[in-house]
Swiss-Prot record:
Protein name: Large ribosomal subunit protein eL38
InterPro entries on file: Ribosomal_eL38, Ribosomal_eL38_sf
Record-level Gene Ontology MF annotations: structural constituent of ribosome
Lineage, opening ranks: Eukaryota, Sar, Alveolata, Apicomplexa, Aconoidasida
GO BP annotations listed: protein-RNA complex assembly; translation
Annotated Gene Ontology cellular component terms: cytosolic large ribosomal subunit
Keywords: Ribonucleoprotein, Ribosomal protein
Family: Belongs to the eukaryotic ribosomal protein eL38 family.
Pfam families per record: Ribosomal_L38e (PF01781)
Underlying gene: RPL38
Amino acid sequence: MPKELKDLKDYLNVLKRPDAKSVVVYKKKSKGGLLSTKFKVRCSRYLYTFSVPNQVKAAKVEATIPSNLEKKVISNKKN
């Protein structure tokens, strides 16, 4: 079952856990032209999701991902 994280501190604590395996970053452009970013952290029991609507804040959050975790970036490009 996925769990949604609302707070940045909770997300950072999940990243530091020893059972965190990988992070998938989804970058999706909406119809209004805004870019929303979702971070999905795979742990042993749950998949934790943290979404950021602000592009500048999302870049800062993406920089906090530890190097020992596998990181995969998926961007949705629509013409």
